[in-house]
């Protein structure tokens, strides 16, 4: 089972956390879930060049707090918070509510599966060699002190091949069946002239023991 399910969703009941934190009546639940989905996609597309690793939406009554985890907070905040305020007004215009925006810097971007996968996909779109890109990414990730293992799977018409295939690169340990294992996972897509190439990244950061 550990090979088939999403490693992050599989561990939500042990040590994971949801991207949406709120309670809603059953009649409003579907509407709120859909709104969270579109808000998250809008935020990620608006700051695709910056590198958003996580979007957390918290709701309480009529208030809504959105926390953005990114590599370079200064590019989102802007001079004296002008860019952040401008984006807040764009959210109000598009979705009909004025949220409270918080920006948190990702201290270790090389141990974030989201940022690593997006970086690999971006370089593949620039027509770089997939083997060189992935091996370099794995070496960079393994230099982090908290990382115990990393695996990258790349699928599609690699290097423009006529037949699509999957290449898997792995270093260290990735215990997918261990529930207490802190495994970060993400899937990114590289849109190339040959078609779409899928990039999957697993990063193992040790075990989590709760007393």
From Swiss-Prot:
GO MF annotation list: mRNA binding; rRNA binding; structural constituent of ribosome
Family matches, as CDD domains: KH-II_30S_S3 (cd02412)
GO CC terms of this entry: cytosolic small ribosomal subunit
Keywords: Ribonucleoprotein, Ribosomal protein, RNA-binding, rRNA-binding
Highest taxon above the source species: Bacteria
Record InterPro entries: KH_dom (IPR004087), KH_dom-like_a/b (IPR015946), KH_dom_type_2 (IPR004044), KH_sf_prok-type (IPR009019), Ribosomal_S3_C_sf (IPR036419), Ribosomal_uS3_bac-typ (IPR005704), Ribosomal_uS3_C (IPR001351)
GO biological process: translation
Gene3D superfamilies per the UniProt record, alphabetical: 3.30.300.20, Ribosomal protein S3, C-terminal domain
Ranges of residues in domain KH type-2: 39-107
PANTHER family: 30S/40S RIBOSOMAL PROTEIN S3 (PTHR11760), SMALL RIBOSOMAL SUBUNIT PROTEIN US3C (PTHR11760:SF19)
Function: Binds the lower part of the 30S subunit head. Binds mRNA in the 70S ribosome, positioning it for translation.
Family from the record: Belongs to the universal ribosomal protein uS3 family.
Subunit structure: Part of the 30S ribosomal subunit. Forms a tight complex with proteins S10 and S14.
Protein name, per record: Small ribosomal subunit protein uS3
Organism: Neorickettsia sennetsu (strain ATCC VR-367 / Miyayama)
């Amino acid at each position: 089972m550990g090979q088939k399910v999403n490693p992050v969703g599989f561990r939500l009941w042990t040590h994971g956390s949801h991207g949406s934190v709120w309670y809603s009546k059953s009649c409003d639940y579907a509407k709120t879930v859909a709104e969270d989905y579109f808000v998250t996609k809008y935020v990620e597309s608006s700051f695709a060049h910056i590198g958003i690793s996580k979007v957390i939406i918290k709701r309480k009554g009529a208030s809504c707090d959105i926390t953005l985890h990114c590599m370079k907070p200064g590019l989102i905040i802007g001079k004296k918070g002008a860019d952040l305020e401008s984006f807040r007004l764009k959210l109000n215009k598009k979705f009909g509510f004025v949220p409270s925006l918080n920006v948190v810097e990702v201290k270790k971007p090389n141990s974030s599966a989201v940022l690593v996968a997006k970086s690999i996909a971006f370089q593949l779109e620039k027509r770089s060699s997939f083997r060189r890109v992935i091996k370099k990414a794995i070496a960079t990730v393994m230099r982090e002190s908290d990382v115990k293992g990393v695996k990258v799977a790349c699928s599609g018409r690699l290097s423009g091949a006529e037949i699509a295939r999957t290449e898997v690169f792995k270093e260290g340990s990735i215990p997918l069946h261990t529930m207490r294992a802190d495994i970060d996972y993400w899937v990114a897509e590289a849109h190339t002239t040959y078609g779409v190439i899928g990039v999957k990244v697993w990063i193992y950061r040790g075990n989590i023991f709760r007393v």
